Amino acid sequence: MALKIVESCVNCWACVDVCPSEAISLAGPHFEISASKCTECDGDYAEKQCASICPVEGAILLADGTPANPPGSLTGIPPERLAEAMREIQAR
């Protein structure tokens, strides 16, 4: 079991203090989750604490590689609408 933090991480430190297994550390350009320490909060919390506090959509991946906070999950803006709005802005 292990989650993964990817390059879109903004190093806000929010996840470090909420990790019950102390599996998150700064290791290069962004934080890293230790695969040997990460329990995905099983037995401690119903939700993965790092993902629940992360302010960046897609910065934390589940073990299967899917985003813990997929596009639209934090903003409430459906990804289709966001893509449409971006096209409208770029067309100006």
Swiss-Prot record:
Its cofactor is [4Fe-4S] cluster. Pfam families: Fer4_7. Disulfide bonds: none annotated. One of its GO terms (molecular function) is 4 iron, 4 sulfur cluster binding. Keywords: 4Fe-4S, Electron transport, Iron, Iron-sulfur, Metal-binding, Nitrogen fixation, Repeat, Transport. It comes from the Bacteria. One of its GO terms (biological process) is nitrogen fixation. Residues 2-28, 29-65 form the 4Fe-4S ferredoxin-type domain. [4Fe-4S] cluster 2 binds at C38, C41, C50, C54. InterPro entries: 4Fe4S_Fe-S-bd (IPR017896), 4Fe4S_Fe_S_CS (IPR017900). Binds 2 [4Fe-4S] clusters. [4Fe-4S] cluster 1 binds at C9, C12, C15, C19. Signal peptide: none annotated. Ferredoxins are iron-sulfur proteins that transfer electrons in a wide variety of metabolic reactions. This is Ferredoxin-like protein in nif region. It comes from Azotobacter vinelandii.
